[in-house]
Amino acid sequence: MSAQPVDLQIFGRSLRVNCPPEQQDALNLAAEDLNQRLQDLKVRTRVTNTEQLVFIAALNICHELAQEKSKTRDYASNMEQRIRMLQQTIEQALLEQGRITERTGTNFE
């Protein structure tokens, strides 16, 4: 489906962006989050220059994204290691089962 114009209010300013209809709710939530971040920064930093606040917010968001990417990479690496260990355990168990079957002459069917 094609993108449609959506009007947003962020930090007292109107902004029109194109967005697919199925993503409009997520866009509105993102705009609300950004607006809240800018308001919080304004209070916390006492910076009044909107451009500076936007840059600070962008840097904070980029930092958060980098942290989340790092966590995701660490988690994926951990899961890959666990999967390899499980595969080795299963392979070892199957080899042992094969040796036991050969010794006893038992067929499992």
Curated annotation (Swiss-Prot):
It is found in: Cytoplasm. The keyword Cytoplasm applies. Gene3D superfamilies: 1.20.5.50, Cell division protein ZapA protomer, N-terminal domain (3.30.160.880). It comes from the Bacteria. The keyword Amino-acid biosynthesis does not apply. One of its GO terms (biological process) is division septum assembly. Keywords: Cell cycle, Cell division, Coiled coil, Cytoplasm, Septation. InterPro entries: Cell_div_ZapA-like, Cell_div_ZapA-like_sf, Cell_div_ZapA_eubact, Cell_div_ZapA_N. Residues 22-99 form a coiled coil. GO terms for cellular component: cell division site; cell septum; cytosol; plasma membrane. NCBIfam families: PRK10972.1. Activator of cell division through the inhibition of FtsZ GTPase activity, therefore promoting FtsZ assembly into bundles of protofilaments necessary for the formation of the division Z ring. It is recruited early at mid-cell but it is not essential for cell division. PANTHER family: CELL DIVISION PROTEIN ZAPA. Homodimer. Interacts with FtsZ. Belongs to the ZapA family. Type 1 subfamily. This is Cell division protein ZapA. It comes from Erwinia tasmaniensis (strain DSM 17950 / CFBP 7177 / CIP 109463 / NCPPB 4357 / Et1/99).
